[in-house]
């Protein structure tokens, strides 16, 4: 028993290449040997190979078996050797698989996908809700979460966790930030507002300099807590700044004056409601905002803004610029028709 245990330990310590080479050699040579020992029973190489494979991987079918003493002795060797070879291979594959799962859970595996969204930071409810809403959207397929936690705080097939400091280029490389669609920076939890915004600013400037290094513009959205810190972020070239605490204050104040308005806002922001806010590009046949407004309205949607300019409703005859980013309110089916260039029947 001790002999077989030591033999198994030695085989397990073999390099993968050595083990594969040894296994292939065993399966190649064994049929030749059994053919030499019992040429009548194993008249072809294929019959010998079939017997070796069945003997080492199953209990045997009994269609081919050695009948002479030398054949039986060799058969015994094949059984034990095959048992250790197959057992070692299975053990090594299992070990690699368990190691892969552990590395993925601990955020030590690099992400090599493209067109993903990167979320930096973690807080239980806020970011969980954000991820839920993003994954409910058809345009979001994969999310990479960067945080300094011992293991992934969320288990989902579309979420890849990276453990590391977001202010280090190595971490951004591992998350493949250069080929992401956008980076979302959440304010750190449990930190006073003046320090939290400082950390967010440091991350934002790191992403900006990283983008210059890889020669790509990285679309960045940052959550900040204090309005008087807005000016500090101008130099960081953050594409969108969200005042999280103030947004809630505005919503509550508006709801108290215009009762029921909060439900309207929440429905437009949630991916679970029927009508949502979408972004579309300008069509060639749309010259003025009125052209776009009328066609979009006829299809059952509503044009509300170009970028952050909501005054276009009062300027219907203004020519739409080529770089227009038109925001509409529509259900999913209507949005698909508009974005795919659906033509209205006259």
What residues fall within each predicted segment?
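Cytosolic regulatory regions of ion transport systems
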Residues: 1-23, 36, 65-66, 70, ...
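Hydrophobic alpha-helical transmembrane segments of multi-pass integral membrane proteins
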Residues: 24-29
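Pore domain of cation channels
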Residues: 30-33, 41-106
């Amino acid at each position: 028993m001790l002999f077989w245990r030591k033999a198994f330990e030695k085989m397990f310590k073999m390099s993968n290449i050595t083990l594969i080479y040894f296994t292939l050699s065993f399966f190649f040579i064994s049929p030749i040997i059994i053919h030499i020992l019992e040429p009548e029973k194993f008249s072809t190489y294929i019959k010998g190979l079939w017997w070796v494979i069945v003997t080492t991987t199953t209990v045997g079918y009994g269609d081919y078996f050695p009948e002479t003493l030398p054949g039986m002795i060799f058969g015994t060797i094949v059984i034990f050797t095959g048992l250790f070879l197959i057992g070692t291979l299975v053990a090594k594959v299992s070990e690699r698989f368990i190691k892969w799962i552990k590395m993925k859970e601990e955020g030590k595996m690099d992400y090599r996908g493209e067109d993903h969204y990167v979320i930096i930071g973690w807080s239980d409810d806020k970011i969980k809700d954000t991820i839920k809403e993003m994954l409910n959207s058809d345009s979001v397929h994969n999310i990479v979460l960067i945080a300094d936690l011992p293991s992934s705080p969320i288990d989902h097939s579309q979420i890849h966790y990276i453990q590391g400091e977001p202010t280090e280029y190595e971490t951004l490389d591992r998350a493949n930030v250069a080929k992401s669609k956008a980076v979302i920076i959440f304010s750190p939890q449990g930190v006073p507002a003046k320090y939290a915004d400082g950390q967010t600013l440091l991350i934002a400037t790191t992403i900006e300099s990283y983008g210059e290094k890889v020669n790509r513009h990285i679309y960045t959205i940052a959550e900040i807590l204090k309005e008087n810190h807005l000016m500090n972020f101008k130099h960081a070239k953050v594409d969108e700044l969200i005042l999280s605490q103030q947004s809630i204050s505005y919503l509550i104040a508006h709801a108290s004056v215009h009762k029921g308005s909060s439900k309207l806002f929440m429905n437009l922001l949630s991916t679970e409601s029927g009508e949502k806010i979408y972004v579309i590009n300008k069509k060639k046949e749309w010259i003025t905002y009125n052209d776009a407004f009328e066609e979009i309205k006829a299809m059952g949607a509503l044009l509300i803004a170009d970028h952050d300019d909501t005054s276009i409703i009062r300027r219907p005859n203004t020519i739409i610029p080529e770089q227009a980013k038109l925001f509409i309110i529509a259900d999913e089916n209507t949005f698909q028709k508009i974005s795919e260039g659906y033509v209205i029947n006259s």
